């Protein structure tokens, strides 16, 4: 299964609680933190919810 490298590039300060929870569920914490996740429809949906906060690359 393909992997995605997800990096949090924008701060969560002032963001709605729902977006904060999605970022935490992806495994991200502070700005510039990076995590690798399997490419699945569930992860893609989570990325779409916070696309303006993260950068996604194929790993």
Swiss-Prot record:
Q: Which GO terms describe its cellular component?
A: cytosolic large ribosomal subunit
Keyword Ribonucleoprotein on this protein?
yes
Q: Which keywords annotate this record?
A: Ribonucleoprotein, Ribosomal protein
One Pfam match, given by its short name, reads Ribosomal_L30
Q: Which GO terms describe its biological process?
A: translation
> Which family does the similarity line name?
Belongs to the universal ribosomal protein uL30 family.
Protein name from the UniProt record: Large ribosomal subunit protein uL30
Q: What gene name is given for the protein in this entry? A: rpmD
């Amino acid at each position: 299964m393909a992997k995605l490298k997800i990096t949090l590039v924008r701060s969560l300060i002032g963001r709605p609680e729902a977006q904060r929870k999605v970022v935490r569920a992806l495994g991200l914490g502070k700005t510039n933190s990076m995590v690798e996740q399997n490419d699945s429809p569930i992860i893609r949906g989570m990325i779409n919810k916070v696309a303006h906060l993260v950068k996604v690359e194929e790993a």
